[in-house]
Amino acid sequence: MFSKADRPVLFATFVLVSAAICPTPAAGGQGASQSHEREALGHGYARPARSPHSSRSEVIAPHGMVAASHPLAAQVGIDILKAGGNAIDAAVAVNAVLGLVEPHMNGVGGDLFAIVWDAETERLYGLNATGRAPYELNRQVFERQNLDRVPGTGPLTWTVPGAVDGWDQLLTRFGTMGFAEVLAPAIAYGRDGFPVSEIIQGQWAASERSLAEWPTSAATYLPNGRPPAVGEVFKNSGLVRTYEAIARGGRDAFYRGEIARTIVSFSESNGGYFTMPDFEDHSSVWVEPVTSSYRGYDVWEIPPNSSGIVALMMLNILEGYDIASLGHNSAETIHLITEAKKLAFADRDRYVADADANMLPVAELISKEYAARRRALIDQMRASGTVRAGDPTDNAETVYLTVVDKDRNAVSLIESIFGGFGSKVVPADLGFALQNRGSGFSLEPGHLNSLEPHKRSLHTNMPAFVTKDGKPWLSFGVMGGNMQPQGHTQVLSNIIDFGMNLQEAGDAARVRHGGTLQVEPGVTDAVIAELERLGHRVRRAGGGGMGGYQAIMIHPETGMLHGGTDPRKDGMVIGY
């Protein structure tokens, strides 16, 4: 037995076997060779026959687990747990590291949502840590500039960053550590540097031209006049100073101190509309997660302005079909998922907005009765023609993470600056980009999501949690703009309808509808032909856009933690 101090860390491991490792065929010839081959297969070097969707196992561990989109961040979370911190402490530490190592995806210039399972009270808590539009920004500003929509980048897209206040709310209510402890690993990596991975480098390079338009952004993210190369060590002294200020002064250092004053001063000089009251008046909101059941499992999401109810609407519609009998990624299954998505997104575009500014019919939208009425609109033999044209929220960059600790506290957290490097603007020398979440507003007067001063925009982000018989079962999320509700639906169907484990559920081929139906490799040519016969416009997916997934399950029988992560990103699950 291992003592508490020297328990081994459990890693998901790939084993590559070269021919030199295998025994040389015996003189007996083919029969001996086949014997050795059977022996090698018997020792586990072949993919299990039951796992056509995955090339690696779930991670399984007894004590604590972290699933994050970057290995360094996941390891930091485990270090926090082993140092005596709980899941909430670890989640904030992981998020801070992700803001450094995946700066195009997230950071303190962005917003977050979280769902917390508190083991002591045995209930879920939701946190909406999203920011609002500046007090001085209104639709007339855009009219004077002859703009009929909010741009995708620049100062007119800025909303107050909510992440730091979200961290403070999480640590104050449920954490055991302070900012100095949880930010220390990110500060160290920012000062000493970290090597840039291949996936991140490619996404970083895609924003080179727009980052170069802002001298402060270029100084931060284009060292030596270019994006870092694969394997090159990147340091961020500006973000280190920002994190150190938060570590010393807490959330007020960001919203009432020098950081806020620097952002406001930069805004005033560069065509923005931020004022100090925008930051001083900012606060996160604890909310009741909303829920609906899917085949006996209770699925929990954050209410609007999050898009969480969209996944619940899709699942409610699909529950009326025997999906398992139709087959995984069959034409029939993909058709139903796509048609459910069209209906749910039509409702999202009409009803998902800032709940503080609108009366929203959330309970009605996620009711089984409403789902039955919407389901009746689906023609199982023909694709509907009601396809939304154009979507300003489609290019979203986000990180999702989840942590479960030894006491079975759990956190499901998603954080984002929206587009790649957000607004593309780094304020002064603070070391992070401000989000472009304001581009999610409509400029249509009377629309529930219409831009107003001090209002939250529609958010694509949505962490999720699943309980079974009142007990915590699954903490998961699928980052990636409008893929999120579609990803939640497909992952849960993979697990519940098709019996996949967490790794299989994430690795399996996905589909995404956004006018055209994109399908990943693994969807057969015959299925594509049948989908086209039904009236769908189909193309093979390429270049990303299918989301990134992390999940941790608390096994209801053994109590063990099972984890899965997405091969589409640099994700890693680590347990101990």
Question: Where are the model-predicted features located?
Answer:
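Noncatalytic scaffold domains of N-terminal-nucleophile
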Residues: Q30-Q75, A87-G249, F254-R256, A260-S306, ...
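Short, small/polar residue-rich loop motifs at catalytic or cofactor-binding pockets
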Residues: W286, N395-T398, H459-N461
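Bacterial N-terminal signal peptides
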Residues: F11-P23
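Active-site rim segments in enzyme catalytic domains, especially the processed small/beta chain
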Residues: L100-G107, D111-G126, F274-T275, N409-L474, ...
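Alpha-helical support elements that line or immediately flank enzyme active sites
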Residues: I80-L81, D165-R173, G249-R256, R261, ...
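Extended C-terminal subregions enriched in glycine
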Residues: D407, K455, H488, D497-G544
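Bacterial N-terminal signal peptides that target proteins for export
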Residues: M1-A12
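Internal maturation/activation junctions in enzymes
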Residues: G44, G320-I417, L430, R437, ...
